Amino acid sequence: MRLTAFFLLLLHRYFFNNYQLLINKIINKMKPTLLLLAAGMGSRYGGLKQLDGLGPNGETIMDYSIYDAIQAGFGKIVFVIRKDFEDQFREKILSKYEGHIPAELCFQALDDLPEGFSVPEGREKPWGTNHAVLMAKDIIKEPFCVINCDDFYNRDCFMVIGKFLSELPEGSKNRYAMVGFRVGNTLSENGTVARGICSKDADEN
């Protein structure tokens, strides 16, 4: 009798746990993912600014973005980092989100290129944004939003893009959007910054 009860308990736990995993996957599948680009070398800053805290409790800039994204309905976060500071990143950033939201790492490496491409001799500088996003191709299968980890956005931005991503028909491909800012609101009085100008044509493209 005791053995039977023991096996029944094991079966119950097995099916319950797998049921919960299935439900979580279904729920998270309906939510967009936030992809944070955090592999920068910080050459001008002089260090890993993505790990430096600036909030009252040591919050980083990306912590504020992640909080706002979660409030806007995002269901997973993925970080693109460099392998050489993985341990430091896990300890300072990733650990705080365990049990709160699914979080994963992927790594940007200079020689991780599509077939047919190679690193030019003498190249040491990391590739740009497109290459960083490509590093997450095997992890992200759902609609996602890309941000830089050292830029400050605001909750409204995540609400707007989160709504767009959540309303995409299942199986949609090549559907894109961008949340823009008025240029004047992005300039600093403490130095020069580079900004891109975006415009729309008569067809709203």
What spans do the regions from the language model cover?
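Active-site glycine-centered loops adjacent to acidic/histidine catalytic or metal-binding residues
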Residues: 40, 150, 182
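Conserved beta-strand scaffold positions in the cores of enzyme catalytic domains, especially
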Residues: 51, 105, 176-178
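Short N-terminal binding/cap micro-motifs at the start of the first secondary-structure element
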Residues: 42-46, 187-188
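Conserved core of the sugar-phosphate nucleotidyltransferase
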Residues: 155-205
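Conserved N-terminal catalytic core of the sugar/cofactor nucleotidyltransferase
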Residues: 13, 19, 23-36, 42, ...
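Ala/Thr-enriched low-complexity intrinsically disordered regions
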Residues: 4-5
